[in-house]
C-alpha cells in the first residue's frame, strides 16, 4: 500500500469511529499535506492550523500533517486535493498557476513597497472574494493565505542601479512571467531545477538566483553569494486550501471551526515569518555576505521596464482580479 493509500484509508476509518451509543461524540481525523521541509513557515502554518482545529473542536476534529513531500510533490498534492483523496494542502501559489490561470496575478512584479501593503491587499474583502472564487472554480476552498515575505535576489555581482542587472545569469523557476520579468530588466534568466542551484552557483554556471530569505538560508545558498539584493519583486504567498466538495459537505459548525482556525493560523504564520526573516538576515550578514537595498529611482526603473510583463498578465487573467489587485497602486 502506498503512503497516500494508507493515509486515505486511515482518514476514512477514523471518520467512522465511535460506539453506537447516543452520548458518543463523533470524532474525525483528516490528512493535510505539504511539500515543504518541517522547519519552514509553510509547515508552521499547517501545524498551527491543525493545533487550532483540535483546540476549537475540543479534540473532536483532528488534522494529521504530512510534511516534506511525504504524500507527493506540489503538483501531486494539488491533483489529489482536487480529487478529494487529501482534503487539505498548504503550499505556495506558484505551482497553482498552471491549474488556475488567474493566480498569475501574483506574478505581477514589484507591485508592493512593503509586506504590510501586500497583506492589506490580500485581506481586502473584495480582492479576497475574487481570488476565493478562482479556487472554488478549480475545486478548492481557500481557507487562508500567509507568506514567507518577499522573494529577493542573491548574486555575486553587486546591484547598485538598474543597469547592474544587465547580463546577470540568474536561475528562475520554469514560469514564463518570471522569465519575461528578468529579461525585461536586462538579466539573462535560466530555468533550472532547484536541486541544481547550489552547484550552479558553486561552479559559476549561474551568477544569481531568487528566493525568499528563508530558502536562501535553509539551503545555504548565501555561502556561494557575495550579495543579497532586496529586489522584493514578488511576494512568496502560501495558501491553505481544502477540497471544496469536502468542505461544503461538513456541518456548518465544523465549517466555522475551520474558518476560525485558518484565520488564527494565518496571522500566526505571518508573525513567525517576520521573525524568521529577521533571523535569516542576521545569519547572512554574520557570514560576510552583504545585503543591498534598492533606491526609489531603481525600483521605478524596474517597474517601467516591466510594462510588457504587466500587459501580458493583464491580457491573460480576469480583468476584475487584475483591477482589484492594482487598485490603489501608483
Summary of predicted features, one role per range:
Residues 1-4:
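Bacterial N-terminal signal peptides that target proteins for export
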Residues 7-11:
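Alpha-helical assembly-interface signal, strongest on the long, hydrophobic N-terminal helix that forms
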Residues 12-16:
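C-terminal motif of bacterial Sec signal peptides marking the signal peptidase cleavage site
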Residues 17-118, 135-330:
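N-terminal secretory/targeting leader peptides
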Residues 116-132:
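A gly/proline- and charged-residue-enriched helix-loop-helix capping module
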Amino acid at each position: 500500500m502506498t503512503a497516500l493509500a494508507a493515509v486515505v484509508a486511515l482518514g476514512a476509518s477514523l471518520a467512522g469511529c465511535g460506539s453506537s451509543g447516543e452520548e458518543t461524540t463523533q470524532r474525525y481525523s483528516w490528512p493535510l499535506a505539504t511539500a515543504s521541509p518541517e522547519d519552514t513557515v509553510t509547515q508552521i502554518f499547517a501545524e498551527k492550523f491543525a493545533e487550532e482545529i483540535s483546540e476549537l473542536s475540543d479534540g473532536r476534529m483532528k488534522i494529521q500533517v504530512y510534511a516534506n513531500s511525504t504524500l507527493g510533490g506540489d503538483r501531486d498534492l494539488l491533483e489529489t486535493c482536487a480529487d478529494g483523496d487529501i482534503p487539505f494542502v498548504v503550499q505556495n501559489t506558484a505551482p497553482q498557476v498552471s491549474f488556475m490561470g488567474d493566480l498569475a496575478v501574483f506574478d505581477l512584479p514589484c507591485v508592493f513597497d512593503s509586506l504590510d501593503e501586500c497583506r492589506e491587499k490580500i485581506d481586502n474583502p473584495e480582492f479576497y472574494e475574487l481570488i476565493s472564487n478562482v479556487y472554488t472554480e478549480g475545486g478548492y476552498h481557500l481557507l487562508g493565505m500567509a507568506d514567507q515575505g518577499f522573494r529577493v535576489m542573491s548574486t555575486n555581482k553587486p546591484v547598485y542601479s538598474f543597469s547592474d542587472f544587465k547580463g546577470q545569469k540568474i536561475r528562475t523557476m520554469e514560469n514564463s512571467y518570471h522569465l519575461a520579468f528578468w529579461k525585461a530588466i536586462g538579466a539573462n534568466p535560466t530555468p533550472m531545477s532547484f536541486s541544481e542551484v547550489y552547484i550552479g552557483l558553486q561552479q559559476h554556471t549561474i551568477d544569481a538566483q531568487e528566493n525568499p530569505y528563508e530558502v536562501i538560508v535553509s539551503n545555504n545558498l548565501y555561502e556561494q553569494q557575495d550579495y543579497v539584493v532586496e529586489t522584493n519583486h514578488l511576494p512568496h504567498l502560501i495558501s491553505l486550501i481544502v477540497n471544496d466538495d469536502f468542505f461544503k459537505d461538513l456541518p456548518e459548525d465544523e465549517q466555522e471551526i475551520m474558518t476560525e482556525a485558518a484565520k488564527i493560523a494565518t496571522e500566526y504564520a505571518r508573525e513567525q515569518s517576520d521573525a524568521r526573516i529577521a533571523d535569516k538576515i542576521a545569519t547572512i550578514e554574520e557570514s560576510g555576505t552583504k545585503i543591498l537595498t534598492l533606491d526609489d529611482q531603481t525600483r521605478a526603473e524596474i517597474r517601467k521596464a516591466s510594462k510588457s510583463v504587466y500587459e501580458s498578465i493583464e491580457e491573460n487573467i480576469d480583468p476584475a482580479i487584475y483591477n482589484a489587485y492594482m487598485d490603489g497602486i501608483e
